[in-house]
Amino acid sequence: MDKRLLTIQDISCVGQCSLTVALPVISACGIETGILPSSVLSNHTAGYSGWTFHDLTEDMPKILERWLTEKVSFDAFYTGYVSKAQIPYILEIMEKAARPGALRIVDPVMADNGKLYTGFDEDFPQEMKNLIKDADVIMPNLTEAAFLLGQPYVAEGYDKAFIEKMARDLAALGAKNVIVTGVSFDPSKLGVAVYDGNKVEYYFNEKQAVSSHGTGDLYASVVAGALLRGKSLLEAASLGADVVVEAIKLTAGDKDHWYGVKFEQALPYLIKRLS
């Protein structure tokens, strides 16, 4: 039976993020991809003057009921931007629609640059802990890691001991494997710390001159797809970083393309790396 993944996150109709990234990227990895939209937005919330928003929480139990009737099941679950009220439904879906040994991959999307995103209150990190406590892989950035651990956000000046303690403390919340993104010990390098429950390893790229919207969603989607293709945790984490850098380079110089990265043009690179 071919592997099937369910990704649960919002649809921003324009803006190259969330489900509009996850579906094509994971499909390009050769994995059948089902979607469960958590909400629908006209566009993402970074840089636009406004947006529309439609919540889909009430649809989740109805969809699960239909899936159970049709005997629909999944080899993996990958969650992104979701609301506090949706987490209990998501946990039920992960329990009832799972094939044996199904992976739970959680990108705890809620914050960056020391602040929670618009729409999340200070209780949200506590609720997110319920989603990560039985996860196989979690992928917080430094800000999200700090919120999950109830610690102050440290943007720079940290060392390996700090990051490695952070990774182990996150695993102590229940996650089997941890990828901390946005790690840097050198101003010219940016990368990830990868903890497999035993040791912490690192992978770095040259730091790009621009900061781009949607790269976190691209990264998490590549990692999820690569894991389902049988790549190791470090291999998947490294490939995700390389694909993000490739997409940023393909977008560089196009001032009109401020809202995301041209990840579509990086898909041949991703496919080649997986072959």
Spell out what each predicted region is.
Residues V210-L233, A237:
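Short, small-residue alpha-helix embedded
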Residues C13, V200-H213:
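Short pre-catalytic strand/loop immediately N-terminal to key active-site residues, enriched for Gly-Thr
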Residues D2-V106, M110-T118, A266, I271-K272:
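Conserved N-terminal subdomain of the carbohydrate kinase-like
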Residues L234-S275:
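Charged C-terminal helix
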Residues T118-E201, V210, L234:
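Conserved phosphate/ATP/ADP-binding segment of small-molecule kinases
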Residues I8-I11, S38, G80-Y81, D107-V109, ...:
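Fold-independent oxyanion-binding glycine-rich loops
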